[in-house]
Amino acid sequence: MEVKGEIYRVSGPVVTAIGLQAKMYDLVKVGNEGLMGEVIQILGPKTIIQVYEETAGIKPGEPCVSTGSSLSVELGPGLLSSIYDGVQRPLHVLLEKMGSFIQRGVSADGLDHKKLWDFKPIVKKGDSVKGGDVIGVVQETVNIEHKIMVPPDISGTISDIKSGNFTVVDTICTLTDGTELQMMQRWPVRRPRPVKAKLTPTRPLVTGMRILDGLFPVAKGGTAAIPGPFGSGKTVTQQSLAKWSDTEIVVYIGCGERGNEMADVLSEFPELEDPQTGRPLMERTVLIANTSNMPVAAREASVYTGITIAEYYRDMGLDVSLMADSTSRWAEAMREISSRLEEMPGEEGYPAYLSARLAEFYERAGVAESLCGETGSITVIGAVSPPGGDFSEPVTQNTLRIVKVFWALDAKLSQRRHFPAINWLNSYSLYKDSLNDWFADNVAPDYVPLRERAMEMLQTESELQEIVQLVGSDALPDDQQLLLEITRMLREIFLQQNAFHPVDAYSPFDQQYKILKAIMKWGDAAMDALKSGVPVTEIIKLESKNVLAKVKYEEKFDESMNAVLAQMDKEFASLRGR
């Protein structure tokens, strides 16, 4: 039911209306052009609305109309391969309607209401169904079978069910009480979709990035943050995760970042192959583009839209990864709206409820048993852009309280052209211990001890670097000079990775293990040679060390690795034979 009021005051994206009988978070059409807005505060007769479109030119006295429903997204077949703005308007539809520049007050359906999908029922007349039950399937892409579920708040007995080609708005099932079900369902973005139970994450998200998988793994259903200063590689890391992580669905939210970065994703993803299925990456991806020049209020909507779409696919029993780049821009939008509302500012001007909003978002991640009995997961990876790389600022600190994995990007590493520029001394993962059994069973029994040894060596190196800067490496004992050489190999061969190299961009677990084991084998053999009296200068000159550095770029990895290991054995045998 539509309720009319009128505009009383306009302050940037915040509009005050009077005479509008609306509820909190109701969707409102603002002004003569019908701009999309959402009720965020009610003060007696005044209703405060945040508007998701540019408010220039609207004035007091213009009408405000409440739609009576909250901001919702359309969920159903056709989400994959789509690119939306922050409020689920398909950008290709907006392009057809008005060209390259988006005008205001234009609405578009989130899903294509005319496209036909082949619906195959898996229930029959007379069956009882409840919220979350699967009534049929649609082949959405070659690899994704889309399960059509009963909306969570509906239950009953089936009186009629159809089979064949239908659009998402056609009635495919009728219950005895007259309720009609379509392939599409609408869901309010601020309300988490219900689940039977939340479960403990026990499987790692395989990213193909050696430093993440090897040293700081995130579990499927986990939460991770990538904070870092400008130019340290947040977006490239996020895009690498979106390209190569082993989840069935990827939701990528460009929240307040540069438009060119979204353009990169759009140009690259259709050409790249998913390493798990061999299909184009775009077939498993939903993109939400809310760039820095779009209205700030829509940044909040884009984050909630993305997580709601992710929850929908999780309910089908799929593993979903969600990349939000960057949550700092969302926090800045909250700060702007909060100041327009004249609320009491918290630290650095951010609203006092900043941590509550961030927690609300990250807590929607996790492994869950859905209402239909399937187990799915949402892994949320949020980039944070602290001004000047200051990790003590409120957004980073509040994020760190919530997430369990911290990948700290370091400007000094990026200046040295060490990418990914993740500082191995500042980063951590709280999922390590719970994933150790998986690594022992699926990678190698000695993988975890190898990883711990590598971390100890890297920490010892950082302590030795202080002495080296004072007196030089030649003043160190021979065993410590050799340790510095082994850790240099760890950094340059194992931790460094080229995100733009056709082979090195994605490193499977067995390759990661073999590279790490080869470096450790070289280090152990070098230490044995040193103890038997071989000078450290002779050991450092060995050619196998340089050949090992090139193995990660080889397409025939196993052949190259076996050749290097044979060369290594030969060189150390000749050293000992002198």
Swiss-Prot record:
GO terms for molecular function: ATP binding; proton-transporting ATP synthase activity, rotational mechanism; proton-transporting ATPase activity, rotational mechanism. Belongs to the ATPase alpha/beta chains family. The gene is atpA. Produces ATP from ADP in the presence of a proton gradient across the membrane. The archaeal alpha chain is a catalytic subunit. This is A-type ATP synthase subunit A. InterPro entries: ATP-synt_VA_C, ATP-synth_a_Xtn, ATP_synth_asu-like_sf, ATP_synth_asu_arc, ATPase_a/bsu_AS, ATPase_F1/V1/A1_a/bsu_N, ATPase_F1/V1/A1_a/bsu_N_sf, ATPase_F1/V1/A1_a/bsu_nucl-bd. ATP binds at residues 228-235. Its EC number is 7.1.2.2. GO terms for cellular component: plasma membrane; proton-transporting two-sector ATPase complex, catalytic domain. Signal peptide: none annotated. It comes from the Archaea. It catalyses: ATP + H2O + 4 H(+)(in) = ADP + phosphate + 5 H(+)(out). It holds the Pfam family ATP-synt_ab. Has multiple subunits with at least A(3), B(3), C, D, E, F, H, I and proteolipid K(x). It is a peripheral membrane protein. Keywords: ATP synthesis, ATP-binding, Cell membrane, Hydrogen ion transport, Ion transport, Membrane, Nucleotide-binding, Translocase, Transport. It is an enzyme of class 7 (translocase). GO terms for biological process: proton motive force-driven plasma membrane ATP synthesis. It is found in: Cell membrane.
